[in-house]
Amino acid sequence: MESGYGFRFSDDDVESASSLTVGERLCAAFLPFVAIAEAVFFALTDCLADLLPPSAAASRHRRSAASSYLAAVARKWNHQQRGRVGIGCTSLTLRQLARLADESRCFSVNEVEALFELYKKISCSIIDDGLIHKEELQLALFKTPSGQNLFLDRVFDLFDEKKNGVIEFDEFIHALSVFHPLAPLEDKINFAFRLYDLRQTGFIEREEVMQMVIAILSESDMKLSEELLEAIIDKTFEDADADRDGKINQQEWKEFVLRHPNLLKNMTLPYLRDITTVFPSFVFNTAVED
């Protein structure tokens, strides 16, 4: 198999157990800076898999299943929650929904309301307080509430804009709005840059890229040889590090992405725009106050 950068790799380099894992998405374009957003949102929706019959969950085709999967979750959720809001899962007023939609610059009021249902389910999975704690995000992403994971730490840190140790609903909406089809390209570029700027120095360094790629692959069924990883990162920095100082600054990153637009293809999730079409029951059956 050959990558977009001209690398060739064999079965010894890549060991894959299932289709469309995080690692396979990463290696589909075969660059370290790919497939983060889609992996995150698929994982967030996958946290609701226990609401579906096992046969349905086992037989779905992952890439095309997002919409039908969320619809099934919506029907099940509305049936279970009819007539009550749930402890710790507060309601929103129409004014609050409108404010969040306006601040997002992308989502409609109905889309914010629909995403509120997803947020409530995640935020009540362990600690029933209507806030997403790191353990709850880890359970959503990796099916386990414990363990160390660099990828989880970075995603949580980017979502937790107020740095108070939890993800509030306005932060949840703000972070997901970056992946909306109508979100400015500049926002997508900046989000991807911040994900890899582990030390928050304003630069992406080689070691940071290596750490993040290893963390992502460790949660998938794919393994790459150390030699191949080094070769990929060498080529990436050769292309992106224009001033050859061993790190990628924000301007270099922007120019790199604009030369390789496929790097951000998974930073746009079309079904975020269709979320109310997929499950309109969210709009009419949720606990929203006038």
From Swiss-Prot:
It comes from the Eukaryota. It comes from Oryza sativa subsp. japonica (Rice). The gene is CBL9. Gene3D superfamilies: EF-hand (1.10.238.10). Induction: By abscisic acid (ABA). GO terms for biological process: calcium-mediated signaling. Belongs to the calcineurin regulatory subunit family. Residues 111-146, 147-182, 184-219, 228-263 form the EF-hand domain. Homodimer. The keyword Secreted does not apply. Expressed in shoots and culms. This is Calcineurin B-like protein 9.
